[in-house]
């Protein structure tokens, strides 16, 4: 009898543990983009902006999601933090895609300052019970290998420390490829935006399921 009871408890605990360990799907209906010119649609007509393409991609896949683009060309992490309160006033936001930091790197802002700003942004967003997808950036070597190392460590560390969703590099498959960038070699062209949209869509669908 004792053996039967122990077996019952054993299997009950297994079922309970497995049930608790499954990550619950997220209900996402409204997404806000918080970034700089890499996400704002710099140099492109409005119908080619990331918010339009990403929303279309998601809708065509059966996800009724609205995308609002609050990215501003030239913004640093400090600028994003300064206008965050206005962004948090947008009603019924389920997810914010945070893609700031590229201009910090171009301006040589100390990585610890960028990290501090992004951490404050993340904390304030989480306080509103809004999910975050952190889109990482990578530095060039123009400011030295030490700067690059410190900058590149910002995003994975923030993701880990805050337990938030993470897409390691916003410009994955786009950066340094002339076929996917405008003549300045920095900002994505329409084909580049489409690739970014595909990559972000995969991350969004992954956190919904």
Predicted feature residues:
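Bacterial N-terminal signal peptides that target proteins for export
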Residues: 1-9
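Short hydrophobic/aromatic segments of transmembrane alpha-helices and their interfaces
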Residues: 5, 61, 175-177
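N-terminal start-of-chain detector that recognizes signal peptides
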Residues: 5, 42, 68-70, 138-140, ...
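Residue-level signal for mature regions of secreted extracellular proteins and peptides
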Residues: 13-14
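C-terminal motif of bacterial Sec signal peptides marking the signal peptidase cleavage site
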Residues: 17-19
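Serine-esterase "nucleophile elbow" of acetyl-processing enzymes
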Residues: 21-75, 79, 83-92
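Alpha-helical cap/lid subdomain in secreted, periplasmic
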Residues: 26, 81-209
